[in-house]
Amino acid sequence: MKKFKLTSEFIVDISGVKLFRIKALIEFGNVKAGDLGGYIEKEENLSHMGDAWVSDDARISGNAQVFGNAQVFGNAQVFGDAWVFGNARVFGNARVSGDAQVFGDAQVFGDAQVFGDAW
């Protein structure tokens, strides 16, 4: 069962890629059906399993994936081939990119950047 859908609302990121606002279809975690989330490029960026969610003005693009119970919010960005999973939280103006992985109970926030092959 799908937990979210892409809406027709979109923004265009600095590299010209269209990112679509997401909308919750069911209740899970702290998310209620009908809640609007952040922006993703494609459905594959956010898992339909677990409580993972992207909210506020957060952006997920490229081949990046958010799954498990991970949360990305605020103005955070996850892109490239990066993964955010487990109970990890990425928020504020933080960026995760490249082949980086943020997982477990890790928190990346403020203006922090995790990139390259970091994990």
Where are these regions (language model features)?
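Terminal amphipathic alpha-helical/low-complexity segments used for targeting or macromolecular assembly
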Residues: 1-49
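A detector of tandem-repeat and repeat-rich interaction/domain scaffolds
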Residues: 47-119
